[in-house]
From Swiss-Prot:
Substrate binds at residues 66, 80, 92, 176. One of its GO terms (biological process) is phosphate-containing compound metabolic process. Expressed preferentially in stamen, pollen and flower, and at a low level in lateral roots and root elongation zones. The gene is PPA3. This is Soluble inorganic pyrophosphatase 3. GO terms for molecular function: inorganic diphosphate phosphatase activity; magnesium ion binding. HAMAP family: Inorganic_PPase (MF_00209). Disulfide bonds: none annotated. Mg(2+) 2 binds at residue 107. Coiled coil: none annotated.
Length: 216
């Protein structure tokens, strides 16, 4: 190779390659088949539902941050910081592929030993239903235990919980919006059968919604 040709080769190898724009780089790594999964719609509820089912955790036990699902993106976003000094007594989330009258997935409070990071999912067993009215609208909560926690997995009904535990849950939901001047009413806890019925109803409502969407 001549000296002139060698110098040209060196110059071309040292010249910086054009860097594609960010959106071009992102699009080049994605296809229509590799869109990020949506935790509400893409995660299955589980073969044992409505008895045992998957739960996507939104809020960690002991947190003052009110996280919630962003229904458009599927990401977990910060909704607000609680106005009072209370913290969530247990992990809180939703059941995938369910739908309630407020157009949200069904809410669940999961009792277990440890806090779980927002965005993770776990298997839970329904043990009861907490009927609740939030600012005049129905906003019932499923009370569940982690099906893979050795301390809680044997619970099958809410009557097996200590009265103090039930009072702790009730008081949290009665008080956590008081400083926002928002009224919440909690009715008597209902047994596991009522929880199973509520979950099944929300599963059916979600299925109807999907069929209606496909027919459009």
């Amino acid at each position: 190779m001549s000296e002139e040709a060698y110098e040209e080769t060196q110059e071309s190898s040292q010249s910086p390659r054009p860097v594609p724009k960010l959106n071009e780089r992102i699009l080049s790594t994605l296809s229509r088949r590799s869109v990020a999964a949506h935790p509400w719609h893409d995660l299955e509820i589980g073969p044992e539902a409505p008895l045992v089912f998957n739960v996507v955790v939104e809020i960690t036990k002991g947190s003052k941050v009110k996280y919630e699902l962003d229904k458009k993106t599927g990401l977990i976003k910060v909704d607000r910081i609680l106005y009072s000094s209370v913290v969530y007594p247990h992990n809180y989330g939703f059941i995938p592929r369910t739908l309630c009258e407020d157009n949200d997935p069904l809410d669940v409070l999961v009792l277990m030993q440890e806090p779980v990071l927002p965005g993770c999912f776990l298997r839970a067993r329904a043990i009861g239903l907490m009927p609740m009215i939030d600012q005049g609208e129905k906003d019932d909560k499923i009370i569940a235990v982690c099906a893979d926690d050795p301390e809680y997995k044997h619970f099958t009904d809410i009557k097996q919980l200590a009265p103090h535990r039930l009072q702790e849950i009730r008081r949290f939901f009665e008080d956590y919006k008081k400083n926002e001047n928002k009224k919440v009413a909690v009715n008597d806890f209902l047994p596991s059968e009522s929880a199973h019925e509520a979950i099944q109803y929300s599963m059916d409502l979600y299925a109807e919604y999907i069929l209606h969407t496909l027919r459009r």
